[in-house]
Structure formats: structure tokens, C-alpha cells
Amino acid sequence: MYLKSLKIYNFRKFGTNNNKIEFVDAKSFQEQRNKKEVNIAPTTTLIVGKNNCGKTTIIKSLDNLINNNKDAFKANDFNFLYLKKLIEYYEQAIPKLDDELKEKIKTPYLQFNICIGIENNSNDLVTNIVRFMKLDDINNSELKIVIKVELENEEVFIRDVKKLLEKNDNSSLRFNSFLELINDSDFKINYYNTDNDKIDNFNIKNLIELRPIKANNIESEKCLSKAFSKIIEYRYKTLFEEESDNLNSTIININRTLTKLISEKHTVSINKSLEEIESNEKLQVLLRADLTFQNVMNNLIKYEYVERNMNIPENQFGLGYTNLMMIIADLIDYMEKYPENSFNSKVNLISIEEPETFMHPQMQELFIKNINEAIASLLKSKNKNVNSQLIITTHSSHILNSKIHSGNTFNNINYVTTKNNYTHVVNLHDDIIIPKSEKKAHKREQDLKFLKKHIKYKVSELFFSDAIIFVEGVTEETLLKYYIDDNNKLNKYYISVFNIDGAHGMVYHNLIEILQVPALIITDLDIERDDDEKKNFKQISDLTGKFTTNKTIKKYNDDSNSLEELQHEQLKINNMYIAYQGKIEEYYATSFEEAFILTNYKNELLNSVLKKMKPQIYENIMGEGDDFTKIKENSYKLQKKLSNDKSDFANELLYKFITEDITIPSLPKYIKSGLSWLAKKLEGEE
């Protein structure tokens, strides 16, 4: 058996929509089971998202339910928006309670829907769960369990709510009193099937085990010694009883030898001295050795690592390495102690929350690979068949990369964010990110392969960004970061800028829409020119009969590459804003550099950079005078001459932005409009 999904209703930030967390699909689980080599990566569930979005809530809900901890659910665990709507309902319903109202009064509850996958020809014990199963469930090889945290006495609760409403007129005081009432009320955990039939004498703990592993568990300089001492102690006491008896016999003999030696060397001499003070019948000391198995485990085991044949003590370990080893120590402890029959008859979950603590990026990138190899080694050495699912919560882009590349898939990744004050879960899957297509099967495979590889190079930050900007060149990538930092509306948000050319950037569009992160895509008109126009550096002032080579514009322009009827300067598609050049100072720019030159052709700083970068060309254009309209009229020529020096051009501009007290050039209008849209989107105005 394995955990397929969990739906959370009204618990903390969770509401009633976009509340499903997917763990393992049948295909991934079966593929892992059929492989000879252990590889937990494809079935590892990753829960990613920024801080305070609901990642920990998912693990907490499982922990409370599995441990049947009904007392752990307090008023603060209910979604406050849900409770506010509930009290508004009471204000309307309770006055009608005695006469008009016929239906049952609603009471606060939490709900958790668990879906368990069952393997075909499985040896899993199903006697305890058959009451939850329906014919459809059997056909789908799954069962669904509905768990509700409900009031023990609804009548008393409704009576107390009525008193509360009569007593408090102030809405704020009412709500606080309502929270106190919920805290003072007793709740129970009930189980139902999907027909809402109550199932008695059932406990989810008999079906699911959860082992939470704390990632940030470094309490002292000797935490590793303590952790591994516990493991060795358990192994001796449980797995190697005969050796344990031999060790205890050795300890007893050591105590006898030491006690005899101490007695001969010290005890007799000390007692003779004491006889001078008091009779030895009244005052005498006994010195003896007291070495125990526990003392050996706690104090005599030293944890060291070897570096170039030198033993390095534990307190010189880096925190990241110590953190990783503590996690592995917990895994060893878990697998050593857990009985084989429990692994095969239950859903076994291991959760690790935010393991990236103290780890440097490279260690994070290899985290799942390291954990996978540790588990594989443990299973091989113990000859155990451990049917466990790993659940990791993280806000590290490196751990995300680790999951994608170790498992070679986007499957089983849950992106958690907040939307309208509710937790919003997005379930990722290869088939959603790059939809299947019979006609374009090969291209789909290539796109998916590209995305898995390319996302490693910083683009994984889009999962943790407030907004993202895609650009197609080094100039706009370099300069935009400066302009964003200088923008008081945007600089308070985490905005990532990615430089990906348009054709490859399109591979990300499905993912961007799925994640619903506001995305500004800055692209170029890429006006198609004939050979004469290129040779003579012809300026374009009219788009009649003109076409674009830009695949992004073509895709969202009804698959047409004609520029004649193209919407002016932008295309809006859901959470994406595609910005491109409109007419600037009488001309249409074909690139960002040309648009920047056209917008700022009179700007002193820009002219000084152009003159420095291309002195001969600049002099030929300007001649003896200072008529800057000549710069405007030769914008295409200038951008073509700069095409091999874009990085130098961008850095020279940036250097002058920072060091010179002079008017900074403006961004082109199409980019300004895009940034304005982004600001409104982030502030909830769009």
C-alpha cells in the first residue's frame, strides 16, 4: 500500500479548493517496486514553496491524525476565514432556531480525505480497511478514507454560541469569544467512507506510520556521538544478544580488575588514614569501578572522520555535514528498529522538514541522491524490504533540482503558495508541464529533457519568486536588475530575471501558467528584413507587409507571423504579460538595444557610452555637429554594430549608472508598461 493523496479542508490556511496534495501515483510506485536497484527518488514527494505558505501544515495534519491526537486541534488550527463565515451564519440561523429553521445547524469541523493506493496481487493486510472500500475503489486499486475532527456535543456548543451572540455586540469581541468557545469544547476524530457512513472501531495508526525526522537537530557538539551510540546500543541489545552478553561479561571483569587495583593502591591507604580520625567501624570508604554498558555507549564512543589519514574530531565538523549525518542517523535508527511485518502491512511515511538547514548549495543539490544511497545501502546490509515513502518539505531551489534530477521527473512535486489568503496547492506532473501529443511526441520528449536539465541553472528560483521576468539578452538582463532595484514598488518583492532566448523560453510557458506566478516576458519584434534592408541598415517606420521571426509572438498572435494587425506593445495571457516594441520616435525597433537607443537618443550618458564603444561609427553618424536626431535615424545600424559587444555595452552603462551623477536613461515604454503591470499584479490591483 502507499499514500496517493491527501485533501485538507479548513485546517489552518487551507480552504476547500486547491487543497489536494499528491504523493505517489500508481505508475511511479510500480516502476520503483519492479526495479532491482533501490531508488526512492521517483516516489519521493517534494513539497516546495516560500516561507509561511502551508508546507509544515501538511506534515502536522498527518502527524496529528496518525497519532489520534484530537486534543492537538485547537481554535487556531481552524481557518479563520472559515470561522468568520461560520459566525456570520450563526448570526442569521440561530435567531430562527426555535421556529423557522428546519435544517441541522452547522458546527465547526476539520476534514481530511486520504486516498490509499493498493497494489495488484498485494500481500497488504486489508481486513481493517474493507469497510471503506467500494466497487469503484477496487477497480481503481485504491480506497478513500474521510477523517473528520468533530464536536463531541453539538447541542451544548450551539447553546453556548447562542449565549455568546446575545452577550456580545462587538464583532471583534464576538470572534475572540468564539475562539475561546472552540478551545473549551471537546472534539473527537471520526472516520467515514465516501458515502458518509461512519466507520467505528478504526484507527488510522493501524494503517499508516509516520516517522518525522527533524533536520535542524544539532543540540550540542557531541550530537552525532549520541545519535550513533543509541544505534549501536540498540543493535547490541536487540540484534546481537550473544555479543551483548559477552560484552557485559567483559565489562564485569574490567570492573573486578579495576576495583581490585584501586583497592590495593588507594582504598587500603585511605582507610588507614581515616582510622586516625574515627574508628573504622564507623567511618570507612569503598572505592570501586562502576563501568556499565550505558557508560560505554554514552561516553566511550567517539565520532570522527578521516581526512588524509588524520582523525578529525566531531566538534570540527561543518554544520551542514553534521545536519546530513544526523538525518542519516535517524534513518538508520528507524530502519533498524522497525519490524519487517510492519513495513509490509502498513503505509510507512518518513518526513524530513527543510533539510537544507546549514547545508551549502552543492550538498543540497546532492541531498536526495545521498539519502537514496544511504537507504539502499541500509536495505542491502539488512536484507530488508522497506516499503517507505519519503516526504520532504523545502524552500530550497537546490533540493528541488536534486529531486528533479535524481528522479528524472517533475512527478510528485507539490508547489504550495498562498492565494487570496488561502493555501493554494499546485500538483506538478510531466504530462501537465509538457502535455502529451501524438503528432509531436519526439519534440515533447526533447522539450521535457531540456526543461529538466535547463531548470537547474537558476531557473528553479521561479518556484520561490514573487514574480519572474524572462528576457532574451544580456543587456536587458543586466540593466533590468538595476531598474527594479531603483523602483520603490518592485524592490520590496523577490523578482527573478532569467535570460532565455524566446524559442527555448516558450518551453517554460505551461509551467509558468500552472504555478500562477506573475510573469513578464520581454521579447523583441524581430522584424524580418531582406538583404538590401540589412545591408543598408534600413530603419523601419511602417509594419505594413512586415513579418516577425519571433516564435513567442507568432504563438500568441493566432499562429501568425504578420506584424500588421499585432496588438499594440503587449499580449496578456492569464498570469503572463508579453511585452514587445511599439513605435518609438517614428521607428519600430527590432531589439532591446535599438529600443533603448531610440528612447534615449538625446541622453548624455547613453551617447558617451556609444561614443566609447564604437568611436569611429559614432563619429561617422554624428559628423561635426551635435544633432542627436542622427542617432535616432541610425538606431538599427548602432544596434547591429553592438551585436557582438552586448555584454560590454550593458556593463559600461551600468558602471556609469552607479558612478556618475547624471540623468539615467529611461526604459523603453513597452518595458515600463510591463513593469507597471507587474507592480499592480503583485499589489493585487490587476
UniProtKB/Swiss-Prot annotation:
Homotetramer. Forms the core of the anti-phage defense complex. Interacts with GajB; 2 GajB dimers dock at opposite sides of the GajA complex to form a 4:4 GajA-GajB assembly (GajAB). GajAB interacts with Bacillus phage Phi3T Gad1 protein; this interaction forms a 4:4:8 GajAB-Gad1 complex and leads to GajAB inhibition. It is an enzyme of class 3 (hydrolase). Pfam families: AAA_15 (PF13175), OLD-like_TOPRIM (PF20469). GO terms for molecular function: endonuclease activity; metal ion binding. It comes from Bacillus cereus (strain HuB5-5). Component of antiviral defense system Gabija type II, composed of GajA and GajB. Probably a nicking endonuclease that is strongly inhibited by physiological levels of nucleotides (NTP and dNTP). Expression of Gabija type II in B.subtilis (strain BEST7003) confers resistance to phages phi105, and SpBeta. During viral replication, when nucleotides are rapidly consumed, it is de-suppressed and degrades target DNA. A divalent metal cation 2 binds at residues 476, 604. ATP binds at residues 52-56. Coiled coil: none annotated. It comes from the Bacteria. GO terms for biological process: defense response to virus. The record marks 131, 134 as: Interaction with GajB. Residues 1-423 are annotated as: ATPase domain. Its EC number is 3.1.-.-. Its cofactor is Mg(2+). A divalent metal cation 1 binds at residues 472, 559. Residues 463-599 are annotated as: Toprim domain. Keywords: Antiviral defense, Endonuclease, Host-virus interaction, Hydrolase, Magnesium, Metal-binding, Nuclease. InterPro entries: AAA_GajA/Old/RecF-like, Bact_Antivir_Def_Nuclease, P-loop_NTPase, TOPRIM_OLD. This is Endonuclease GajA. The keyword Acyltransferase does not apply.
